[in-house]
Amino acid sequence: PVEAVIVDVGNQRQQTFLNAPEATVMGVEAEGKKYFEFADQAAFISNKRWLVQANYTWSDSDVSVGEGDTVITLGGGGRPEQASFFIQDGSRLQGQSEHVANLQLGWEDDTARSQATFILNYVSERITARGAGVGTAREPDYLQEPGAVLDFVYRKDFTVKGRDLGFALELRNLLGTDFEEYQEKGNKIRINQYDLGQSASVSLTARF
């Protein structure tokens, strides 16, 4: 597997990539989807099919590094270096989160030719780049916890003068989730943090 690693090149710290010797990944995924109808309720509710859909994935990984394994990095001048200096044996695969979940709540209205969905995604902590070193002198890995992101999508089809049109509204990151990359060695050290912002997009399409 290809992994990002932080290396010192002269007086600068740079990110490069290397091939980890070996990794094992295992996991379990569960998914469910159900529509609900409420015929005896008010028209706004009874005209629609209400959707509940969820997906959850648990995964675990293990990177294996032996004594004789070598890698070539940006700062090594093309010479093979000990892989164990850059990757800790038994550590989690870079970019892999233990928990990934998705929840969708929405409705579909065939009469009004419309649908709306709230989409909640959650991703737990993951490694974004390796810290190099040996023993207690090893630089902590760079970590990120994407957290929860909530989006809303609305679509409606309609006809004007015999022409089929489609309207779409998309609202992204309603919870205002930020990006944060950090190291942990006793205390949390922020490496990179910024506001992802919230966005909205509107589109109108014509079908020919």
Per-segment meaning from a language model:
Residues 1-4:
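Membrane-topology and secretion signals of cell-surface/extracellular proteins
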Residues 6-8:
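Flexible hinge/switch segments at interdomain interfaces of large molecular machines
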Residues 12-130:
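Gram-negative outer-membrane beta-barrel transporters
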Residues 19-21, 89-93, 137-145, 190-191:
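Short, contiguous acidic/charged loop-to-helix segments that flank catalytic cores in large enzymes
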Residues 45-49, 98, 109-113, 147, ...:
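Strand-connecting loop/turn motifs
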Residues 121-132, 156-208:
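C-terminal beta-signal and adjacent terminal beta-strands/loops
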